[in-house]
Amino acid sequence: MGFGFKILVEQSIQLLTVAPRLVPEVLQQPTIRHPIAVSLGAIAGALSRYYLSLWFAQRFGITFPYGTLFINITGCLAMGFFYALALERLSLISPEIRLLVAVGFLGAYTTFSTYALDTFTLLGDRNLLAAGFYWAGSSILGVISIQIGIILGRLCQ
């Protein structure tokens, strides 16, 4: 997963940052480039989410949504870090790369609709303690992780 993801990201960045004279005219238009960037990021984000969820389910079982909890927290951390890095420090990052990472990858990687469904399922199973921990833990730790990510992003020079 890690090696393939790295290649996908490197190729995506290369595709989106190649010299304009080498790119067909149609690909120079933001109305084409932006959806391509989002799509490439979304593929990587969705696959990362899928494989991490499988790993957590195989490792810890399915009685508690550990994978979704981990994904939501790390996604918030990454979003905070990228926000601080891309918007506050490195304004040279192209709009396509920002879309690829923030909207595409992280948008597909962290979906709170799964969070809501998992909470609902735990409540339906009458597992109130786990449902309460999961519901509050995802929200509280997500907000804390955003803040930590921003702090870490601001520390990068």
UniProtKB/Swiss-Prot annotation:
Q: Which GO terms describe its cellular component?
A: plasma membrane
Q: Give the record's membrane topology.
A: Multi-pass membrane protein
Q: Where are the transmembrane segments?
A: 36-56, 67-87, 100-120, 132-152
The way its activity is modulated is described as: Na(+) is not transported, but it plays an essential structural role and its presence is essential for fluoride channel function.
Q: Where in the cell is it found?
A: Cell inner membrane
**Which molecular function GO terms apply here?**
fluoride channel activity; metal ion binding
Family named by the database record = Belongs to the fluoride channel Fluc/FEX (TC 1.A.43) family.
List the protein's name: Fluoride-specific ion channel FluC
